[in-house]
């Protein structure tokens, strides 16, 4: 019934298994990949006919995690998976980016790649397994895909690279880098690093490329046994129409691309396009070329004109040379009520970035396959259509916005202070108000400035720059701070973010083969120079975090209490902590480790709550005098609340220097008194004394009373701590009666 084909290999100390022929057999291609005990199913289905009227590849990638893969039931009311999580969106993009350039030019059939996580061992992240499985399924499917690709994760531990580190090892690594590519070339890099050098980052890319070669070879072996017949598809021949368009448009396109203002340039290019369509597709008479072909060829002509001009003259669309960064204006404190804000403008790209500080209650609760956890740093990127002078859909963030936000998040996170030093939840929102290339890197720069404006003590400021590449044969040009047009028409989009000490994030998307290690090395070095320049421009606005938090930001005080005292602070049914919150107005969060975070915009409220909690958990010191209140009177003494919530007994013999016949003759309930803490007996009962304290001045009278007894020739009395707590013995009987009983009368 099943024609199962398998390939197995040991990869990174674990077994990788690729299997086809048993599951999802009606798909054009399907592969079940297992790495360790993490298993994913990848399927590929392509439409039978091309979609009409489009000039792009209609590829959709959906990565989905199932809760059962980790033996869990989804949360929420419906108890089933809903809209894609952030991770699912990011991994979908991670799969899409390296495979998209490998489809044969002109393929217009709907193509859908669906990757489902079936099992997760909580050690091997499914993203790498998903990329490998998707590559294998595409290779088997028969669609015109010039793969396969391989993918690997690279860590950097103890000064060495680690292939496919476990989830626990990633937490200890100074690098988390994912690289994908073919046998000959790197196509995609996504990474987060803790201020590593350019050489270490490039070494990691090449290490990953080298070590995923066995995976590519295994996919090829599987394809030799199980691949379907290639689709009957002939790439369209456009040489004649491209030549015709270039003949009509080249001169005017060169002039149009000399306009440095984006909107003027776009208008001029649109005018040339309309002229070309009118010339080659006349309304009357025979049309040699269809309007769709002419428009597609016009895009190619645009690319050639821009690329030739850069390679021939070294001059770019806006007149800059290849290394110059656009003019930068940095401003901070631009919003009066925000905790921190900045307006970062680089040429025609502008980001309004706002930082907000919150408490532990504001942390994001994330329900992932690995379990639930909280995230204290959030970065949200918004790209409204007005930023490019257009109308468009508004609503929930799309994949691009989520991806760009995560890139900026990765760039900033390594320089944030640890939670124990800065116990705030941090949210950064980047509103892209203008865009002409590199808006995600503008978000990094603006985010760094807004955080420092809010008083967040970053280790160092970070900046980001987007690099591009034009490659024609042996000639190439690396471009610093690319425009949107240079991004679309170039061969590489290469984003680098970091501090003056090193790289914190690197993202690379390469559209063609032939980009060598040497070219990448040049690009990284040029990016380092550009990043240093941008950091210098940012320093004109702010060089480090402000010494104080923003005026409207909450203040948080952190204290550590013994874990066995947590229940005392919370109280029965939360009674004590609710009382503290209600009476002080502060927010209080207690962690299982005994860390207590007290938050309020009012410093007095924080101090009151802090002192209250301290009084509950602290232990009184023997011999110290405290203010107290009589809370209960008994025949044998009075109970005094003297140290926060602590009560102790003043025995009747410790109420006054003279003999006391009745407790109520000396003190009343509610009376304010001064007491000396004598200690606690072996049962933990607290003993206090009033008679050794001057109730007016609070002076300790112990030595004075001893001296008076010595003058009277009285023997020094023993400490009552040796006698234990005698308070429950009841009232004394008359001494005369006791003598009579003992004599037998």
From Swiss-Prot:
Cofactors: Mg(2+)
SMART domains given in the database record: KH (SM00322), S1 (SM00316)
Top-level taxon: Bacteria
Keyword line: Cytoplasm, Magnesium, Metal-binding, Nucleotidyltransferase, RNA-binding, Transferase
Annotated GO CC locations: cytosol
Biased composition regions of type Basic and acidic residues, renumbered to the chain: 701-745
Gene Ontology MF, one: magnesium ion binding
Compartments in which it is found: Cytoplasm
Protein's UniProt keywords contain Calcium: no
Domain (KH) ranges: 554-613
InterPro entries attached to this UniProt entry: ExoRNase_PH_dom1 (IPR001247), ExoRNase_PH_dom2 (IPR015847), ExoRNase_PH_dom2_sf (IPR036345), KH_dom (IPR004087), KH_dom_type_1 (IPR004088), KH_dom_type_1_sf (IPR036612), NA-bd_OB-fold (IPR012340), PNPase (IPR012162)
Annotated spans, Disordered: 695-745
Gene Ontology biological process terms from the UniProt entry: mRNA catabolic process; RNA processing
Pfam families per record: KH_1, PNPase, RNase_PH, RNase_PH_C, S1
Binding residue positions for Mg(2+): 487, 493
Predominant place of localization: cytoplasm
Function noted in UniProt: Involved in mRNA degradation. Catalyzes the phosphorolysis of single-stranded polyribonucleotides processively in the 3'- to 5'-direction.
Family to which this protein belongs: Belongs to the polyribonucleotide nucleotidyltransferase family.
Protein's name according to its UniProt entry: Polyribonucleotide nucleotidyltransferase
Organism, as annotated: Methylorubrum extorquens (strain PA1)
Gene expressing this chain: pnp
